[in-house]
A protein has these predicted regions:
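Bacterial signal peptide processing site
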Residues: 31-33
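Beta-strand-rich domains and repeat architectures in extracellular enzymes and scaffolds
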Residues: 59-91, 105-117
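Signature of short aromatic-glycine-proline-rich micro-motifs recurring in repeat-based ectodomains
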Residues: 70, 200, 246-255
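A short helix->beta-strand "capping" segment at the edge of beta-propeller domains
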Residues: 45-66, 97-100
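Conserved beta-strand position repeated across blades of beta-propeller domains
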Residues: 72-74, 115-117, 157, 204, ...
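Short loop/turn segments that connect beta-strands within beta-propeller blades
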Residues: 95-99, 137-141, 179-182, 224-228, ...
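Surface loop/turn motifs at the tips and blade-to-blade linkers of beta-strand repeat domains
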Residues: 61-66, 104-109, 145-151, 189-195, ...
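Conserved beta-strand positions in repeat-built beta-propeller and related beta-rich domains
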Residues: 80-87, 118, 123-130, 165-171, ...
Length: 281
């Protein structure tokens, strides 16, 4: 989500530690719900074998601010919310998709804006390593309060049916949080074919699934929010031309279009936003 130093650090994440964490998480989960480890592991393995391989079908192309270092994207009704990053350049904005924002709020340096999610009349905006989360009015974007946030802030989305937020921190774990206090209420290790999937970034909650960008790539995984198992991999590469990609960075914006099976996709410094369907490859 940040610059080259962050890339180097995250690409060096040890897979052995992640595998150990996967085993610990599995045992803890089984102990909590009374199911045997063998049964739980078998179920996860079966789900992993049915991982869908999806691509994108472009339905439309919209303009996007090429100076927006996109960190979060979400639709609420017909309004598109976008959070951007970089110290001294971070902002949050709202407006109709593909048009200039009607409301914008900038973050003062050195704050580095990250993921966003809307909860009715308010929204949350995370910061990367500033250890604060900002609650805002969803209509005016006025700041309402700040709360301490112990982890790195990456992605966030809201599961209203479960009354919780889902957040990422660049690891293979998703953390569940109270939507009012941001207190952690649980966590989930995300796995693909039994292996942890690190560097989970921008998130989008859709029903009981969580869509997550895998940084730094053009890949999206669809995660079962109950088990942590990846149920689909989505290849979103090739949306930009080679010339457009020279200045742009990776995909980092997923917004489900309410009432449809469509999504809006964009990325950091992308000049375009795409209205797409996820389809079998």
């Amino acid at each position: 989500m940040a610059r080259s130093a962050r890339t180097r650090a995250l690409l060096a994440l040890p897979t052995i530690a992640a595998a150990a964490l996967a085993g610990a998480t599995l045992l803890a989960s089984c102990a909590a719900d009374g199911r045997s480890p063998v049964r739980r592991q078998a179920a996860a393995g079966s789900a992993a074998e049915r991982v869908e391989q999806l691509g994108v079908r472009v339905l439309g192309v919209l303009p996007h601010d090429p100076n927006a270092y996109t960190q979060g994207l979400e639709m609420a009704g017909r309004t598109l919310y976008e959070g951007t990053g970089l110290a001294g350049e971070s902002s949050i904005r709202l407006g109709p998709p593909g048009r200039p924002p009607t409301v914008r709020a900038d973050l003062p340096a050195p704050l580095f804006g990250e993921g966003i999610t809307v909860l009715g009349p308010t929204l949350w905006q995370l910061t990367w390593r500033d250890h604060i989360a900002i609650e805002r009015d969803a209509g005016t974007l006025a700041e309402l309060r700040r709360l301490p946030y112990a982890q790195e802030g990456w992605g966030v989305c809201h599961q209203p049916g479960r009354g919780r937020l889902v957040t990422s921190d660049g690891s293979a774990r998703l953390t569940f949080r109270d939507p009012r206090t941001l207190a952690p209420t649980g966590e989930l290790l995300v796995t693909l074919h039994g292996r942890p999937v690190p560097r989970l970034n921008e998130l989008e909650c859709v029903g009981d699934s969580v869509y997550a960008n895998v940084w730094p790539s053009h890949r999206i995984v669809r995660v079962d929010a109950g088990t942590g198992v990846v149920t689909a991999q989505i290849d979103a590469s090739g949306l930009l031309t080679s010339k457009e990609q020279q200045r742009a960075e990776v995909l980092n914006g997923i917004a489900a279009v309410p009432g449809t099976d469509e999504f809006l996709l964009t990325g950091k410094w992308w000049p375009k936003m795409f209205r797409v369907l996820f389809v079998a490859r």
